């Protein structure tokens, strides 16, 4: 089967590290990088260090409003689908790249496979919520991280087939966890001891653009640190 996979941001590169290597054992995959995350630290480093296959097609689309960016991606992905003629288009998560890939495929009458389908924040002010809901309703095969996500899709009467396959990030952790534990270089450079720190990333606008919300997250991390470690 010929599969066109559309990725564009950091979390999607990480997930593709687990999925693409298995997909390519039995199918023909073409990887498209929209360019939503495009610098070395948010893009190239993952292809190098996680052995993600290099994208066969790079669209170089970044910046602009969510609407403008999605429209540019949609326009660029359309001819790619026509050229590759895939049997399915695979998308991850809830980004502008996700929606553009799903919509372009649906308009070309190509089945959409959505990894991490059925997740909901129930906050329609979030661009990601709109992206994930719309993509789910465009998809033929919805791969869910949990039974709760399957039930959510059933409650929305989606037309595609929803299947609970587990959390792809668990696969990533099992695949790359031993390698990360063996590499103590980053800890030495940061001056921290193994097991004596918490690492968290925050990037969603709803979490980082609101100072009060960001403070809540920091306070929660401090609470978890104190509760989980002997800090006396």
Regions found by a protein language model. Give the residues of each.
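N-terminal subdomain of nucleotide-sugar transferases
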Residues: 1-36
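A structural signal for isolated positions on well-ordered beta-strands in alpha/beta enzyme cores
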Residues: 2-4, 30-31, 113, 141, ...
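Active-site and donor-binding regions of nucleotide-sugar-utilizing enzymes
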Residues: 4-7, 13-19, 46, 58-157
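A nucleotide-sugar donor-handling region in carbohydrate enzymes
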Residues: 37-41, 60, 138-213
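N-terminal beta-loop-helix "entrance" segment that forms/cooperates
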Residues: 37-53
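Short hydrophobic signal-anchor/transmembrane segments that target glycosyltransferases
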Residues: 213-223
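Central I-helix of cytochrome P450 enzymes
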Residues: 222-232
């Amino acid at each position: 089967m010929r599969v066109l996979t559309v990725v564009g941001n950091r979390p999607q590169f990480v997930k593709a590290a687990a999925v693409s290597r298995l997909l390519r054992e039995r199918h023909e995959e073409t990887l498209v990088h929209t360019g939503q995350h495009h610098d070395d630290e948010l893009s190239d480093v993952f292809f190098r260090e996680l052995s993600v296959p290099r994208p066969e097609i790079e669209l170089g689309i970044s910046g602009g409003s969510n609407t403008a960016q999605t429209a540019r991606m949609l326009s660029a992905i359309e001819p790619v689908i026509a050229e590759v003629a895939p049997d399915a288009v695979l998308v991850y998560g809830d980004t502008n790249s996700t929606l553009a890939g799903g919509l372009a495929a649906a308009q070309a009458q190509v089945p959409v496979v959505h990894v991490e389908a059925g997740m909901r924040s129930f906050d329609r002010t979030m661009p990601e919520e709109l992206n994930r809901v719309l993509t789910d309703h465009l998809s033929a095969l919805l791969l869910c991280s949990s039974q709760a996500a399957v039930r959510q899709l059933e409650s929305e009467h989606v037309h595609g087939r929803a299947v609970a396959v587990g959390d792809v990030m668990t696969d990533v952790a099992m695949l790359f966890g031993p390698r990360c534990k063996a590499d103590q270089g980053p800890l030495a450079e940061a001056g921290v001891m193994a097991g004596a720190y918490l690492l968290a990333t925050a990037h969603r606008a709803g979490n980082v653009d609101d100072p009060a919300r960001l403070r809540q997250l920091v306070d929660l991390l401090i609470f978890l640190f104190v509760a989980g470690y002997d800090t006396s």
